[in-house]
């Protein structure tokens, strides 16, 4: 079967159902019943991680910013889960699609900016013109600050897309090289296979780091506007 570098981005199906959907739904069968939630180790670990991330991100926010805690925690769990699911064999990573990442970044950025203009109108407008700017530079700086404001959601989406896509392509290329070298040089194939294993472990870390970075930047945008 002929394949190219982007074959892995095609959503696989089993019996007409998307494989990722089956993977996501299956763990729900293993969840503990409600009367065991208190003593369940998995739930305790999950709550500890959420509290740790929440403390790191929300400590800089005031009372108005704290109301976004649940949304930001849901965001980091969603992005982290989709990134990790993409590392499973024959699965698809939704965050490799720029359209999806823009669909997340634009509403979150717009919500933060609108909140800022509604609650702190003068302070939000002051960001477009730094204090002490020479009069001849005022029009240029206003244009530059406006462009930098509107480019923020694009930077969020492109950063996530590029990092996740680059890792998947590297895994595909090194995996293909390993298969090709097995019939040529076993020693070289073992070296490339070791590199592949290390790269895969690195991708697990990147998947979580990118989820954290995306959510942290949204949190910082929110902090600037609350």
Swiss-Prot record:
GO cellular component terms, semicolon-separated: mitochondrial inner membrane; proton-transporting ATP synthase complex
Biological processes, Gene Ontology terms: proton motive force-driven ATP synthesis; proton motive force-driven mitochondrial ATP synthesis; proton transmembrane transport
Signal peptide segment: none
Membrane topology label: Multi-pass membrane protein
Coarse class of the protein's main subcellular location: mitochondrion
Record-level Gene Ontology MF annotations: proton channel activity; proton-transporting ATP synthase activity, rotational mechanism
Chain positions with N-formylmethionine modification: 1
Catalytic activity annotation: H(+)(in) = H(+)(out)
InterPro entries: ATP_synth_F0_asu (IPR000568), ATP_synth_F0_asu_AS (IPR023011), ATP_synth_F0_asu_bact/mt (IPR045083), F0_ATP_A_sf (IPR035908)
Keywords on record: ATP synthesis, CF(0), Formylation, Hydrogen ion transport, Ion transport, Membrane, Mitochondrion, Mitochondrion inner membrane, Transmembrane, Transmembrane helix, Transport
Any Pfam family: ATP-synt_A
Transmembrane segments: 9-29, 68-88, 97-117, 138-158, 164-184, 189-209
Cellular localisation: Mitochondrion inner membrane
Family listed: Belongs to the ATPase A chain family.
Role summary: Subunit a, of the mitochondrial membrane ATP synthase complex (F(1)F(0) ATP synthase or Complex V) that produces ATP from ADP in the presence of a proton gradient across the membrane which is generated by electron transport complexes of the respiratory chain. ATP synthase complex consist of a soluble F(1) head domain - the catalytic core - and a membrane F(1) domain - the membrane proton channel. These two domains are linked by a central stalk rotating inside the F(1) region and a stationary peripheral stalk.
Complexes and interactors: Component of the ATP synthase complex composed at least of ATP5F1A/subunit alpha, ATP5F1B/subunit beta, ATP5MC1/subunit c (homooctomer), MT-ATP6/subunit a, MT-ATP8/subunit 8, ATP5ME/subunit e, ATP5MF/subunit f, ATP5MG/subunit g, ATP5MK/subunit k, ATP5MJ/subunit j, ATP5F1C/subunit gamma, ATP5F1D/subunit delta, ATP5F1E/subunit epsilon, ATP5PF/subunit F6, ATP5PB/subunit b, ATP5PD/subunit d, ATP5PO/subunit OSCP.
Name by which UniProt lists this protein: ATP synthase F(0) complex subunit a
Source organism of this protein record: Bos taurus (Bovine)
């Amino acid at each position: 079967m002929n394949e190219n570098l982007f074959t892995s981005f095609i959503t696989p199906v089993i019996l007409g159902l998307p494989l990722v959907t089956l993977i996501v739904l299956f763990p729900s069968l293993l969840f503990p019943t409600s009367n065991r939630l208190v003593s369940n180790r998995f739930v305790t670990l999950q709550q500890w991680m959420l509290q740790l991330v929440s403390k790191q991100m929300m400590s800089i926010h005031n009372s108005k910013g704290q109301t976004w805690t649940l949304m930001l925690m849901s965001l980091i769990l969603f992005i982290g889960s989709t990134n990790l699911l993409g590392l499973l064999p024959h699965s698809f990573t939704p965050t490799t699609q720029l359209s999806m990442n823009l669909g997340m970044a634009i509403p979150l950025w717009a919500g933060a900016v609108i909140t800022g203009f509604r609650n702190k109108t003068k302070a939000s407008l002051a960001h477009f013109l730094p204090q002490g700017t020479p009069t001849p530079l005022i029009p240029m700086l206003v244009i530059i600050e406006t462009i930098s404001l509107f480019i923020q959601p694009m930077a969020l989406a492109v950063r996530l897309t590029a990092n996740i896509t680059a890792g998947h392509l590297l895994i595909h290329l090194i995996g293909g090289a390993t298969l090709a070298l097995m019939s040529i040089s076993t020693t070289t194939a073992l070296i490339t296979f070791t590199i592949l294993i290390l790269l895969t472990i690195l991708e697990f870390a990147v998947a979580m780091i990118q989820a954290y970075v995306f959510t942290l930047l949204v949190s910082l945008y929110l902090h600037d506007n609350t």
